[in-house]
Amino acid sequence: MSDICDANKLKYRFRGYFPVVIDVETAGFNSQTDALLEIAVTLLKMDNEGVIGIDKTLHFHIEPFEGANLEPEALAFNGIDPTNPLRGAVSEKEAFLEIFKAVKKAQKASDCHRSIIVAHNAAFDHGFVSKAIERCDLKRSPFHPFATFDTATLAGLAIGHTVLAKACIMAGIPFDNKEAHSALYDTERTAELFCHIVNRWKSLGGWPLLAVDEQDAQSDTEA
């Protein structure tokens, strides 16, 4: 792909995948048995210069599914009280129907053919999202069934640290540990980190890739 204008379109940047940044807060580590309590989803956009940034964020407090396990240690860690009526929690199905609607609309607007989850330690978030979708018997999920972009891995390569707070600070992104472990806060910081890495790679000349014929021509010139 030699056309720079095309290279600056989101649909070409990730092979037709639309990146969706997600963070979940849960009542444990087991996606099959432990409750999903909170989810935030950040949608991204790319400008005419090929710079990726945050578009908007959706945020939901989730009612534990029937029979869900609630690990006291997990609740103490994230500070969530599932019984607090002020949470304004909704069912998993209600939340994911809204998420599907927003993601599919943004995916279509970017002319992408599928969405891919971006998360910090993505296997964890992807597992809880996938299991919730399965419990709700929702069809035609916009998300790839197994592929993800893991910002812990990307940050380890690009910045030299895998912890979200440390990686953000090293990238010049403010991070307040008092706000951490809120799905809304962590999702937006993860989105900023992902965008920083992608944009930094572009600024260093890593994207767009030269087409094969351009590489050959450049090699001939240098020779």
Curated annotation (Swiss-Prot):
Pfam family, one: RNase_T
Site entry (Important for substrate binding and specificity), positions: 29, 77, 124, 146
UniProt cross-references to SMART domains, sorted A to Z: EXOIII
GO biological process, one term: tRNA processing
Cofactor stoichiometry and binding remark: Binds two Mg(2+) per subunit. The active form of the enzyme binds two Mg(2+) ions in its active site. The first Mg(2+) forms only one salt bridge with the protein.
Residues engaged in binding Mg(2+) 1: 23
Cofactor: Mg(2+)
Residue intervals of the Exonuclease domain: 20-194
Gene Ontology MF terms in the entry: 3'-5' exonuclease activity; magnesium ion binding; nucleic acid binding; RNA exonuclease activity, producing 5'-phosphomonoesters
Active site: 181 (proton donor/acceptor)
NCBIfam families (alphabetical): RNaseT
Role summary: Trims short 3' overhangs of a variety of RNA species, leaving a one or two nucleotide 3' overhang. Responsible for the end-turnover of tRNA: specifically removes the terminal AMP residue from uncharged tRNA (tRNA-C-C-A). Also appears to be involved in tRNA biosynthesis.
Protein name, as recorded: Ribonuclease T
Gene this chain is encoded by: rnt
